[in-house]
A protein has these predicted regions:
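Thr-Gly-centered strand-to-loop micro-motif
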Residues: 378-379, 406, 436, 455-456
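N-terminal localization/anchoring segments of enzymes in phospholipid and broader phosphate metabolism
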Residues: 1-362, 366, 370, 410, ...
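Surface segments flanking catalytic/ligand-binding clefts of nucleic-acid enzymes
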Residues: 432
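Helical hairpin unit composed of two closely spaced alpha helices linked by a short loop
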Residues: 371, 381-403, 407, 412
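Catalytic-core elements of nucleic-acid end-processing and repair enzymes
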Residues: 444
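Short glycine/threonine-rich loop-to-helix capping motif typified by GTGT followed
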Residues: 390, 416-420
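Glycine- and other small-residue-rich loops at beta-strand/loop junctions that grip anionic moieties
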Residues: 191, 381, 415
């Protein structure tokens, strides 16, 4: 059944040449190329007809350098921009101001602010939790205060049952079972959806539920139309009764809009159960297809009060992307999930480029700065700003056991090469780094002191921390924290430790490539 639906939603396979000509990437790439060629041609023409432009070019570079040096910005980002402007004064300066102006996303940010204000009315810490917090640990109070006073008002919950999945393989059967039990609605928001076994099984259930009259909604990032799905996939889903939207579809126009991607992975079922974590909807995430060896990923299942926040995050993006009015959001947010008795606290949150609060990074910094015994990290990428470098090295130097597990088989070699440029400073400070020998680590996990942990979609890199829409779940004194710690130790046992000696034996091409790419790493 699932394979039939999956095949039916795929377009008929064209010939090799038709595939090239009909591929949406081709016209978009050509338009981008033409726009770039026009800019280069205009610049060369100006130089030929107006020799004095070179003087103005130097003056512009000096002015921009001074502007950057006095601007509030991460020093590594500043360095990247300074290098680009030094090499390409006119183009680099134009690109800088074009990026800072953010013309392409002003409307998006305005709609985000409006939608976030609507959801915040339905997100509040429950009275019994508020009464308890003053008597709880100081570090929990501080983080809860920060997140509740962020623009989106993320509250802390107690009555939520949490299940941690060590692999996407373990998560999928539970997800399918919960989808089958849905009675009113299913909301799904994913960075990647790819045709295959996993999506076929999910899609079979979604179509069945849509036919039964449930409100079934699917939203995916616009990059899918360039990589995994056909450009008319939305219409194909509509035909089987599923409401669908694309976030930020790619069009042949230069815009900063494309820089912001929806990297979230959220499923909400009847407002009672929710899933999130690193697992996208594609076969490699559940090891049904091998791409980079064994795929190590993690996920959480929430059942109870905390689902309200993930539901609000989905409805915010759905409203921003589509044309739904305020009543649609109110209809679903007015109802609250049933409480489930559980030990500890659960605090889901979102990260958005529309706010300067750096929610995701500050949560990671909180774990690093408040830890007393250990901080264990699993991440596919490691492109750090100064704050994270300082926090990791300082934690290690004050005696905290800081360990990081990264892929043994990276999916992007350049990204791993950039990560290695941080290794020496981290190793010198006492941080231990491991590579997952069986394959690729896609998990985004921080766990500390057997008390607190974060599982979500947020990589430890610039794109996740500054540019993408992300989500995470902070756990405090929840029983699943111990399972996360145990999972890390099992994963470490399968990993090879990186040492200064092994680092020095890296191929020169990768070492050089890492340093070159790291110069523009914050902009990638």
């Amino acid at each position: 059944m699932s394979q039939e639906i999956s095949a039916r939603l795929l377009p008929q396979k064209p010939s090799k040449w038709a595939k090239i000509l009909l591929n949406r990437k081709v016209p978009i790439f050509l338009f981008f190329l033409l726009e770039l060629a026009f800019l280069v041609f205009s610049y060369i023409s100006l130089q030929e007809h107006f020799p004095s432009i070179i003087l103005w070019e130097h003056l512009l570079s000096v002015f921009t350098f001074l502007y950057l040096l006095n601007r509030s910005m991460d020093s590594r980002s500043k360095l990247s921009w300074l290098i680009i402007i030094a090499l390409f004064p006119i183009f680099g300066t134009a690109l800088l101001y074009f990026s800072l102006a953010d013309f392409g996303v002003r409307r998006l940010k305005k709609r985000l602010v409006e939608a976030t204000q609507q959801t915040s009315d339905y997100l509040a810490t429950e009275p019994e939790v508020e009464d308890y917090l003053p008597h709880s640990d100081r570090q929990l109070q501080r983080l809860a205060y920060f997140l509740e006073h962020s623009p989106a008002h993320f509250p802390i919950y107690r009555d939520t049952k949490v299940t941690y999945f060590q692999l996407g393989d373990d998560m999928l059967p539970a997800l399918l079972e919960d989808l089958k039990k849905a009675e009113r609605y299913i909301f799904m928001e994913y960075f990647i959806i790819d045709e295959g076994i996993m999506w076929g099984e999910i899609l079979a259930i979604l179509e069945e539920k849509a036919k039964a009259g449930l409100d079934v909604r699917v939203m995916f990032d616009g990059m899918n139309e360039m990589t995994t799905l056909s450009y008319d996939y939305i219409e194909r889903l509509h035909k089987v009764g599923i409401k669908a939207q694309t976030f930020s579809p790619i069009k042949p126009v230069l815009s900063t809009y494309y820089n912001y991607r929806d990297h979230r992975k959220i499923t909400v079922i009847d407002g009672q159960v929710a899933y999130t974590g690193g697992v996208n909807i594609a076969d490699e995430y559940v090891n049904k297809r091998e791409r980079f060896g064994h795929w190590k990923d993690t996920a959480l299942r929430l059942d109870g009060s905390a689902v309200q926040t993930l539901k609000a995050l989905f409805l915010t993006m759905w409203t921003v992307t589509g044309i739904e009015d305020k009543r649609d959001m109110e209809h679903y947010l007015q109802e609250k999930p049933q409480q489930r008795k559980s030990q500890g606290f659960v605090l889901p949150y979102g990260n958005s480029p529309s706010t300067y609060h750096k929610v995701a990074e500050n949560v990671y910094l909180h774990l690093l700065n408040t830890s007393t015994n250990y901080v264990y990290i699993m991440t596919p990428y490691l492109i750090l700003d100064d704050e994270l470098v300082r926090a990791m090295t300082f934690a290690a130097r004050r005696g905290v056991d800081v360990r990081i597990i990264m892929p043994g088989i990276p999916d992007k070699q350049y990204a791993f090469d950039i990560a290695t440029t941080y290794f020496k400073a981290l190793l010198d400070a006492g941080v231990r780094i491991f590579r997952y020998t069986p394959g690729f680590v896609h998990a985004k996990v921080y766990v500390s002191d057997s008390q607190q942990a974060v599982v979500g979609t947020i990589n430890t890199d610039y794109r996740s921390l500054y540019q993408n829409f992300e989500d995470g779940v902070y756990l405090y004194k929840n029983l699943e924290v111990l399972k996360i710690e145990e999972d890390f130790e099992k994963t470490q046992a399968l990993s090879e430790e990186v040492t200064l000696e092994s680092l020095s034996k890296m191929p020169m091409a990768h070492r050089l490539g890492g340093y070159l790419f790291s110069l523009i790493g914050p902009l990638m």
